[in-house]
Amino acid sequence: KNKTKIICLTAYSKNFATEVDKFADITLVGDSLGSVLYNYETTRKVTLNNMMEHSKSVRMGIKKSVMVVDMPYKTYQNKRDALKNSIKVIKETKCDAIKLEGGNKIKDIIKHLIKNKIPVMGHLGLLPQSVRGKFKSKGKIKSEKKQLLKDSKLLEELGVFAIVLECVETSTAKLITQSIKIPTIGIGSSVFCDGQVLVTDDLLGLNETNIRFVKKFANLKKNINQGLKRFKKEIILKKYPSKKFSY
């Protein structure tokens, strides 16, 4: 908090996790895997089994970063289900913490989980599991700003160790970050947050996306195409496999 910026990146498999772990403080197995890997239009279709299988793979690639797993839609609707599913995820995937979307509406659930020693990361602003229709930024109008600040302070009081702020207007994100002692991790929420998170596939240029907050830091799709093109060409020309690559 208020020191070195926190780096958070997503991973859905061992290979990606191994590379992400070299740079990330937090590796997030996000329910964004629904759109990235399965072409779902919404994260609501992601199941607990989806999250757990990918998380098990990710765990094998992590050595140093904190591993956080998104709890998918409808897996924490009440205290009983939330605790049962959270324990299952942590026990079977060996993750370090789970992430839930929401503030005041799920305060009793968060309180119950933390009381039972479940480490929780919060998520405020745009809540993908609750969105119907177009995604819109949050915190522009006074009432939203007030509620987001209130929810942030509430989550801090409940004991979450960090809060993701998604698509939160700049001045609101700055105010929240300055008003609480736990770290804020921004995604489309300005440079003023204590850290930043992006979907790794997006920032590496693997996905075609026009989301405003996504900056492409590499063009991995181009590199992949070049490699596959060379592979095909060498097979056609009978250059591969040469003696070096044959038994």
Where are these regions (language model features)?
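Alpha/beta enzyme core
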Residues: 1-218, 222-247
